[in-house]
Amino acid sequence: MNILFIGIITQDVINQTKSESLVGSFVDTAAAAAEVGKICNAHNSIDIDFTVLLTHIGFEEDRHLARQLDPAWGVDLIIGGHSHTLPEHAVEENGVVIAQAGTGTDQIGRFDIIVDTDNNCIDSYTWRTVPIC
């Protein structure tokens, strides 16, 4: 199974790291969505079965970003951070599953996902938090 991971962070994170090695920055989710589209389209020659966005832009911005993604790009999942949101359930926007696992080191998020590799999409999933002892 081929999995594509794409990272999205806020301009604030870039400014705080002051790292010249970071490539690209996004002022808004429209710019981020356009960049995700370019990355996904650049990998069209590879049979990508599953695409994950790892973000640090906040839960509501994750939802907003998902609404702007073209379903043809094949983004399946957003695992986010920044706002430290702990939703009771993962949410779906525009066919993209989204979750965060709260803040600190109290818990981690766990997805169990069945992928339909014939159609390159999520067949089923469960999401929950797992306490860290």
Give, region by region, the residue ranges found by the protein language model.
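Acidic, metal/ion-coordinating pockets
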Residues: 1-133
